[in-house]
């Protein structure tokens, strides 16, 4: 009888040890853009990454700045604008995102970035941006995660360092990738030359940055996260570009009452304008002047 009791106790212990843990108690790794949560019922806390399609809501008028609480009311949900930061490591993406969130003291464990939400008042109208600094984390995973990151944004900010030419070349390649990903829709893209305070170490001139923006049809601005120079102008410019794109897409196409010229006539006029060298220079100069104006398309 004693032997049987000991064998039953061993069997019970062995069964308890072999019982698998439930799925809900296993560890979850936040910070991956391509991993969707099982029940996305509210925004993650600031400083954490979200899934490819995070829940969106419209903050209440009483809220100011950035918030991590969600509301279950039916009228409080509205699409937010997701701004994806792209660029090589060390160009200052996380510094710009932290300044956007007014979060100066960063946790050492947040060096790979995260997601920051804040409501900005631009031109008398409130707009909520969700800035996603998850590009470095996605580069640690498979390439399809990076592709998901390139598709997740309402707008894109491509950052390079003016003191690092290789980061400038990488920014140009990222612009080409975005063009391939967003062929049908024209999303706002802003090329940012960060670390403008390192003037003595400059490897990329302002003229080169503007020329690149003109060629790739995007906006351009130089910033300094260290001096907090043009950081506010950058994110307010993102808001204005989003609004302009929204208005441009919503505007109905009104047919002109005049008779349109034939394709051959328009082609001849276009070629005649291109043959004039001065006209080309004027057009390029006009485009280079407008590429750094974030208040116009």
Curated annotation (Swiss-Prot):
Q: Which Gene3D superfamilies match?
A: P-loop containing nucleotide triphosphate hydrolases
Entry keywords, A to Z: Calmodulin-binding, GTP-binding, Nucleotide-binding, Phosphoprotein
Q: What is this protein called?
A: GTP-binding protein REM 1
**Annotated Polar residues bias:** 1-10
Q: How does it assemble?
A: In vitro, interacts with calmodulin in a calcium-dependent manner. Interacts 14-3-3 family members including YWHAE, YWHAH, YWHAQ, YWHAZ in a phosphorylation-dependent manner.
Q: Which organism is it from?
A: Mus musculus (Mouse)
Do you know which Pfam families this protein is assigned to?
Ras
Low complexity composition bias: residue spans = 64-73
Q: Which family does it belong to?
A: Belongs to the small GTPase superfamily. RGK family.
**Which residues of the sequence carry a binding annotation for GTP?**
87-94, 194-197
Q: Which cysteines are joined by disulfide bonds?
A: none
Q: Which GO terms describe its molecular function?
A: calmodulin binding; GTP binding; GTPase activity; transmembrane transporter binding
PANTHER family in alphabetical order? GTP-BINDING PROTEIN REM 1, RAD, GEM/KIR FAMILY MEMBER 2, ISOFORM C
Q: Name one GO cellular component term.
A: T-tubule
Stated role: Promotes endothelial cell sprouting and actin cytoskeletal reorganization. May be involved in angiogenesis. May function in Ca(2+) signaling.
